[in-house]
Amino acid sequence: MKKITRRTVLRVSGLAAASLGLSGYAPASSACVGNGFSGWLQQTFGKGSSASSESTEAAAPDAGAASEAPAESADSSLPAYNADPLTGEPRRSSGRIVGVMVNNISNTQRQNARPQRGIGSADLLIESKVEGGISRFCAVYYDANAIPEVGPLRSGRDQFLQLLMPWQALYYHDGESAPCTKFINVYNYSGLNIGGKSYFDTPTHPHVAHRDSRGRNVAYEHTEFTSGAEIRQAAANAGIGLQYPYESTFFRFADYRTGAENKMSGAAAAKTINIVHSDSYKTTFSYNRWDHLYKMSMYSRADGAFENTVDELTGKQLGFTNLLVCFAGIADYPGDSGGVQQVDYVSGGEAYFFTRGAVQHGTWQKASPEHPFKVYAADGSEICFNRGKTYLAIVDDDEWQNFNYQ
């Protein structure tokens, strides 16, 4: 008899959640590759090997799919809801979201990308493991004009791309995995792979990044950085627009127009959160009640100890208003994938949301690459995030037993 594991249970419940998403189910709003890969896309999402007819300038996520404006928008005394899609604050610009792949390796002194630059300015920081159990970041910004120097850069992976696809975000990276290339081709998605040797490093399309060893004896692949100016140049050279008419938000945020907050009344306290991506890649957060931020630290295999996660540009430790830890089935892509990780988004899974020093347990779902990432409470309502920066972890189900908070 086959053993029924926790992952099996989650996959079954996740498939049910995904079917609800595909059938158009929307909970009530709250106040706050190769033949195999293309065939899998065709069977699962109705996508074949030919490119999608949608272009980079496709319509923004519709209100039924993405996080809608809060219910208060029906109040005629309030101005129209026009929130920043990543933070829920009043909209700062009409710029296109930009996601930059950032190196997070810390195995030895030579194989060490930390401390990174520019990640403290990201509105959304996504962390998930890639090959060899090493975690990687996607630093997501509301506008290319808001990006300082950032890096070290790293290659693209489809688990990050799929989170950005519904938002038509500019995905900026140097190199990419074979599955990532397949997703880009099948969905006709315009990203900026500056490692595309047949395109960049040419007179028409110069290499839009720079090298800086920072006076350290680190491997060459950990020395590449970019900046908002270089990203704008790359986009202009490639004919990619950097303006976008977003009408919804990445998560559901408390309404900035009324000053609403999710105070997590009655929720269990959670001042310290410990996340394990693999044996050597662990992330912890400690809640600061004075500024209501979760301060980030990571284990450094190179130094054999936990260290504050700081932005080298400012020297400041990273802090987030919201933390979202989501568990998913993660495994090597089949065949000779070189250990590239496949995240099972379709099945959904468990989610743990942290804000204001408390925790809320729920579920997440993402029915297809083109569907936004959604997070639900036990009663089926969409979880309400507080306005501000968010850290999102996509964690292997197998590490659930090592996850804890108190």
What are these regions (language model features)?
Residues 31-85:
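N-terminal, intrinsically disordered, polar/charged segments of Gram-positive cell-envelope systems
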